[in-house]
């Protein structure tokens, strides 16, 4: 007996949860949705909760910014409880509360991590960096900006265990001194981006060692390194032919005599050349700098 039209439609109807979870929904649908929405979908039904958990367990990237400005500790721990395949981890939006107790289990079970961002996480300790060092041999990118708990021993552990490191942000890690940075340079010659900004402990010794050992260097941030001088910049120019960007703002002992060599190689420098600075100053003060005849 032939089916009625509405019965045929009913028999061919396919619901979302009927699609293959891992091969279709997780791999090709949920990866395009914001994490906040996915977490909300867990409330729809038990089946949706199970499906979202499959996605979270297989997620390669975790960035709390996708969930809103402040993610609760309970949500963070729940989302990452079973994940063992993370490659990118950012906890900057958890900086108000995250501690070693919250972070270390996640680090310990995700040995494929390549990108880790701990910027501004003031309540962590050196144990967090040691855990990253020991658990993440494939680590390539690490941000520790404004993590003043980073000390020389923890940095040495990182250098010893993460030779594939390509970029490292140590901005305002003021416990670090020349010997620790020199050790890092010797152990991580593939570094392409490094910031030791806002650290008055850094001198020519560290910068010259970085230049000589990390010849693939492309971006170096020395902002506020008050003790760095022209000699270090000349060494940098000599040993780092791939340098693309150099930041030396507030490095009062670095002048155009060393920066000029890099400018001629089209290296991007955050300090204007003297003539340009003079014109800007005149324009600000008297408002007629554009009319000055530079040939006089």
Swiss-Prot record:
Pathway: Protein modification; protein ubiquitination
Signal peptide interval: none
All residue ranges annotated as the F-box domain in the record: 16-63
Alphabetical keyword list: Cytoplasm, Leucine-rich repeat, Repeat, Ubl conjugation pathway
Pfam families, A to Z: F-box (PF00646)
One of the record's GO cellular component terms: SCF ubiquitin ligase complex
Family: Belongs to the FBXL15 family.
The name this protein goes by in its record: F-box/LRR-repeat protein 15
Native source species: Danio rerio
């Amino acid at each position: 007996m032939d089916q009625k039209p509405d019965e045929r439609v009913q028999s061919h109807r396919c619901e979302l949860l009927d699609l293959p979870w891992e091969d279709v929904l997780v791999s090709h649908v949920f990866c395009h949705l914001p994490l906040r929405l996915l977490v909300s979908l867990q409330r729809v039904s038990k089946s949706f909760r199970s499906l979202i958990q499959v996605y979270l367990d297989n997620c390669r990237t975790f960035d709390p910014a996708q969930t809103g400005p402040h993610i609760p500790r309970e949500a963070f721990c729940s989302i990452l409880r079973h994940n063992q395949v993370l490659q990118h981890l950012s906890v900057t939006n958890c900086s108000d509360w995250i501690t070693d107790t919250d972070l270390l289990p996640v680090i310990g079970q995700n040995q494929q991590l390549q990108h880790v961002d701990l910027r501004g996480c003031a309540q962590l300790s050196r144990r967090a960096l040691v855990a990253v060092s020991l658990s993440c041999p494939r680590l390539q990118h690490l941000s520790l900006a404004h993590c003043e708990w980073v000390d020389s021993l923890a940095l040495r552990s990182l250098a010893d265990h993460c030779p594939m490191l390509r970029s490292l942000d140590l901005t305002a890690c003021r416990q670090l001194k020349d010997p620790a940075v020199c050790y890092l340079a010797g152990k991580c010659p593939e570094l392409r981006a490094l910031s030791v900004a806002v650290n008055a402990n850094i001198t020519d010794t560290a910068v010259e060692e970085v230049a000589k050992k990390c010849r693939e260097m492309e971006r170096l941030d020395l902002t506020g390194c008050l003790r760095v001088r022209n000699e270090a910049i000349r060494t940098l120019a000599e040993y780092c032919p791939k340098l693309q960007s150099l930041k030396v703002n507030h490095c009062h002992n670095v002048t155009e005599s060393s920066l000029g060599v890099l400018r001629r190689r089209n290296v991007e420098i955050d300090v204007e050349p003297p003539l340009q600075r003079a014109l800007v100053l005149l324009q600000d003060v008297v408002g007629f700098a554009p009319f000055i005849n530079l040939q006089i």
